[in-house]
Amino acid sequence: MSIFNLFRRPTSAPMARERLQVLLAHERAAQGSDLVAILREEILAVISKHVQVDADKVRIKVDRDEHVSILEIDVEIPRDAQALAA
């Protein structure tokens, strides 16, 4: 490292990249709630084709990390659930 590098301003590319990452994170967070609602309804529709399920017994959890989002879905299916004809 040179003594001249201590007083040099950082280049604009890393700053722009960081700003873009923050902007994308905000956009993904805003779209996430809509996506979760859509996924919930579609997953319920698919499961309901095969087994009778109470919609109130479905729990959805979304965990977001820096690089990954995890969607966890718990569907409570009774042991005596009636299989539906497809």
Swiss-Prot record:
Key words of the record: Cell cycle, Cell division
Q: Does the keyword Cell division apply?
A: yes
Cell division found in the keyword field:
yes
SUPFAM superfamilies on file:
Cell division protein MinE topological specificity domain (SSF55229)
Gene3D superfamilies (alphabetical): Cell division topological specificity factor MinE (3.30.1070.10)
Which GO BP terms, alphabetically?
A: cell division; regulation of division septum assembly
Q: Which family does it belong to?
A: Belongs to the MinE family.
Role, per record: Prevents the cell division inhibition by proteins MinC and MinD at internal division sites while permitting inhibition at polar sites. This ensures cell division at the proper site by restricting the formation of a division septum at the midpoint of the long axis of the cell.
Q: What is this protein called?
A: Cell division topological specificity factor
In its UniProt entry, the species of origin is given as Allorhizobium ampelinum (strain ATCC BAA-846 / DSM 112012 / S4)
